[in-house]
Amino acid sequence: MKISPLPVSDDKHLWVGWDEYHRSIERLVRVVYESGWKFDQVLCLARGGLRPGDVFSRIFDLPLAILSTSSYRAEAGTVQGALNIAKHVTVTKGTLEGKVLLVDDLADSGVTLSKVQRHLQANFPSVTEVRSAVIWCKACSTFKPDYFLEYLPTNPWIHQPFEEYDSMRPEQVVARLKDAD
């Protein structure tokens, strides 16, 4: 399978490939680690925070909890709609409690992180502290995460490597693999 080079990033578009994406997650791990803050669980927001949350959980050797949220739906995930927050958090054992690191891919408008923080305060009294970590923080975000890797003053659209799957269907995957085999 031939991999096409990424377009050049500019003030309006930030193009991120798989290698850069994974390196960015590792650099965010370093930012959180070097802060010295000790937390008990990682809570990632599905879907954008799933990959970073998984990496954080593995590296810090802490339980991973998942909270599903959704707001980007229309036009292959590029238009923000109403925010939906799942009622329940998925955890492998016990409950969500103690100091929680909330992980997502980015702070765009800030609405998701802000509402999730309030959701946790209202519904999870055993959570004693929540801090947030994202790879990218846009200047337009009304919510400033505790930890972020990159501040984006021009608010570009971030083209993440997995976005190609937003508009891909099974028959397209089959055709692509057939061409590659």
Question: What do these predicted ranges mean?
Answer:
Residues M1-D181:
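PRPP-associated nucleotide enzymes
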